[in-house]
Swiss-Prot record:
Xref: Pfam families: CTP_transf_like (PF01467)
E.C. number(s) listed in UniProt: 2.7.7.3
Pathway membership: Cofactor biosynthesis; coenzyme A biosynthesis; CoA from (R)-pantothenate: step 4/5
One cellular component term from this protein's GO annotations in UniProt: cytoplasm
Protein name: Phosphopantetheine adenylyltransferase
Source superkingdom: Bacteria
Organism: Bacteroides fragilis (strain ATCC 25285 / DSM 2151 / CCUG 4856 / JCM 11019 / LMG 10263 / NCTC 9343 / Onslow / VPI 2553 / EN-2)
GO terms (BP aspect): coenzyme A biosynthetic process
């Protein structure tokens, strides 16, 4: 079974994240959405809420699991028996950062990272922008997957 983790903070989960998951399902048997707990980040939604929102959204998709983790991503990948890490790339800056991390992960754990480039119409979508809009009580429905409850 080909299993990948898709790690992130997902604060909140956006249509960009959704796109990466859907595209990953075309070449993986299972995707584990790993929601990292990072004590250095101030999040809008608590970890429990993010896990709940994403699990509820994917409740009818048996090939998707949702878990939180508070260790190195490569250790989480081992815990869930994933052979791959999938990351979404929006910009050249994202690529340069992810390429470095992918090299380190390969050297430390022998795990491969698959970089998926964002569809052009989604490059402006980020959790940061969505959080800012939420802070101003703006409608965010165009930036989150249809059917996702906040």
């Amino acid at each position: 079974m080909r299993r990948a983790i898709f790690p992130g903070t997902f604060d909140p989960f956006t249509i960009g994240h959704y796109s990466v998951v859907q595209r990953t399902l075309t070449f993986m048997d299972e995707v584990v959405i790993g929601i990292g707990i990072n004590e250095n980040k101030n999040t809008y939604f608590p970890i429990e809420k993010r896990v709940e929102m994403i699990r509820k959204f994917y409740k009818d998709e048996p090939r998707i699991k949702v878990e939180s983790y508070d260790c190195l991503t490569i250790d989480f990948a081992r815990q869930v028996d994933a052979q791959f890490i999938v990351r979404g790339i929006r910009t050249v800056k994202d690529f340069e950062y992810e390429e470095t991390i992918a090299d380190i992960n390969r050297k430390l754990a022998g795990i491969e990272t698959i970089l998926l480039f964002t569809e052009p119409e989604l490059t402006c979508v980020s959790s940061t922008i969505v959080r800012e809009l939420l802070g101003y009580n703006k409608d965010i429905s165009m930036f989150i997957p249809k059917g996702m409850e906040m």
